């Protein structure tokens, strides 16, 4: 068995992140009746799940996951910057930024 360098495979973090994003959209809809929050949460959660699945099949196939988390980091980062509210924009922006960093580090640490 080859050592991947990580105790927990990257795709498990990806599935957890996808669940966080999707549940954020569902909670936004439940609390405020926000259909755009529900739609965006489910869309980005589904894309993150697809990206995590692709990572589980081929650890080099990072592009869907990286694009999804990078886009969310940018969008929610701007929302957090303008609103100053940690929930939900700051939380999702921070989690997205962490996922971009984790995927980026894993890209540079893997053998070519």
Swiss-Prot record:
The chain crosses the membrane at residues 7-27, 32-52, 62-82, 86-106. It comes from the Eukaryota. It is a multi-pass membrane protein. GO terms for cellular component: mitochondrial inner membrane. InterPro entries: TMEM14, TMEM14_sf. Keywords: Heme biosynthesis, Membrane, Mitochondrion, Transmembrane, Transmembrane helix. It is found in: Mitochondrion membrane. GO terms for biological process: erythrocyte differentiation; heme biosynthetic process; mitochondrial transport; regulation of heme biosynthetic process. Belongs to the TMEM14 family. Required for normal heme biosynthesis. This is Transmembrane protein 14C. The lineage of its organism: Eukaryota, Metazoa, Chordata, Craniata, Vertebrata. The gene is TMEM14C.
């Amino acid at each position: 068995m080859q050592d991947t360098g990580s105790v927990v495979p990257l795709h498990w973090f990806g599935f957890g992140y996808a669940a966080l994003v999707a549940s954020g959209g569902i909670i936004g809809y439940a609390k405020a009746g926000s259909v755009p929050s529900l739609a965006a949460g489910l869309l980005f959660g589904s894309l993150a799940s697809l990206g995590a699945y692709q990572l589980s099949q081929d650890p080099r196939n990072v592009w869907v996951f990286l694009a999804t988390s990078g886009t969310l980091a940018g969008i929610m980062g701007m929302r957090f910057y303008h609103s100053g509210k940690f929930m939900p924009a700051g939380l999702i922006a921070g989690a997205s930024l962490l996922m971009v960093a984790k995927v980026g580090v894993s890209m540079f640490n893997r053998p070519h």
